Amino acid sequence: MIHMRTGVIGVGHLGRFHAQKYAAISQLAGVFDENAERAAEVAAELRCRAFPSVDALLAEVDAVSIVTPTSTHFAVAEVAMQAGVHCLIEKPFTLDTEEADALIGMAQERHLVLAIGHIKRVHPAIQYLRQAGFGAPRYLEAERLAPFKPRSLDIDVIMDLMIHDLDLTLLLTGAEPVDVRAVGVAAVTDKADMATAWMTLNNGTVANLAASRVVREPARRMRIFWQDRYASVDFLNNTLHIYHRGAGTVPGIPGVRDEAVDLAKRDALAAEIEDFLNAIAAHRPVFCDGVAGRRVLAAALQVRVAVEAFLQR
């Protein structure tokens, strides 16, 4: 148990999960949602308060998750930080980099922890690859495909799904995109529901990322290539295989060895929230801070510009 008063602003589908995790590992003071009935339902489930306003909640907590529509992230986080409350903001960070910069500056001035919910960073496969010492990859490809669900329709598939793989690309390479090309289609909603992006980073790495929220069968895969090996990650099935050049064990592919990495199963959201609270308590960096969240947002906005140009052709 982490002895810290916590709260959740926005307890829709994802916000409810945030509240459950806080209730398990901290002192959950309560929740707020514009839908008072929904807030009361979650509060009853978790035996906490349903606050009548954001301000009322902020007066009773030390840290908060902001799980509201992206268009409201800036305004809600600004009020929270003005109240001296540490913030975990669900991805995407904000609508634009100007809003992100303002929140980063405010957090620094007030010595507050600002975390952005890029949850795939805590996946065991990504943590293993970051610690493996393979260096920056030469090429990455990822596909993140999901059946249509009537959620997160205030944003396009780039900010909804592709942003996860954009974050992992920047994290694994430590580089920035310098050339971005992309296509997309608004198949079901009025925003891009599928998109493919090709990008070159300033260290020479090339990435090819595909995302869709209108498929029948889900898939979440990434393949990462170095000069003498490549890794295949299946996020859906929690598997990691690393194929090394050398003494062969792969049938039909001479000189290639398959290393199946044993990955632990973990509750990613609980790990993310626990890291956030421990960062506050220990005065240490968080798993994904505002600066990192801004980098990913900037890359996603570059992809969006390219997709919108394609849609207008």
Swiss-Prot record:
Instruction: Output the Pfam families linked to this UniProt entry.
Output: GFO_IDH_MocA, GFO_IDH_MocA_C3
What reaction(s) does this enzyme catalyze? UDP-N-acetyl-alpha-D-glucosamine + NAD(+) = UDP-2-acetamido-3-dehydro-2-deoxy-alpha-D-glucopyranose + NADH + H(+)
Key word NAD present in the record?
yes
A single GO cellular-component term from the record reads: membrane
Concerning Gene3D superfamilies, the annotation shows: Dihydrodipicolinate Reductase, domain 2, NAD(P)-binding Rossmann-like Domain
Q: Which Gene Ontology MF annotations are present?
A: nucleotide binding; oxidoreductase activity
Q: Which EC number(s) are documented for this chain?
A: 1.1.1.374
Which processes are annotated in GO (biological process)? lipid A biosynthetic process
Pathway of this protein?
Bacterial outer membrane biogenesis; LPS lipid A biosynthesis
Q: What is known of its domains?
A: Structural data in combination with molecular dynamics simulation and mutational analysis suggest that Lys-91 or His-164 is likely the catalytic base that deprotonates the 3''-OH group for the oxidation reaction.
Question: Where does the signal sequence lie?
Answer: none
InterPro entries under this entry?
Answer: Gfo/Idh/MocA-like_OxRdtase_N, Gfo/Idh/MocA_Oxidoreductases, GFO_IDH_MocA-like_dom, NAD(P)-bd_dom_sf
What happens on changing residue 164 to N? Answer: Loss of activity
Provide the family line: Belongs to the Gfo/Idh/MocA family.
Give the quaternary structure. Answer: Exists in multiple oligomeric states.
| EC class of the enzyme, as a word | oxidoreductase
Q: Which residues bind NAD(+)?
A: 13-14, 38
UniProt entry keywords in alphabetical sequence = Lipid A biosynthesis, Lipid biosynthesis, Lipid metabolism, NAD, Oxidoreductase
Q: Does the keyword Kinase apply?
A: no
UniProt name for this protein: UDP-N-acetylglucosamine 3-dehydrogenase
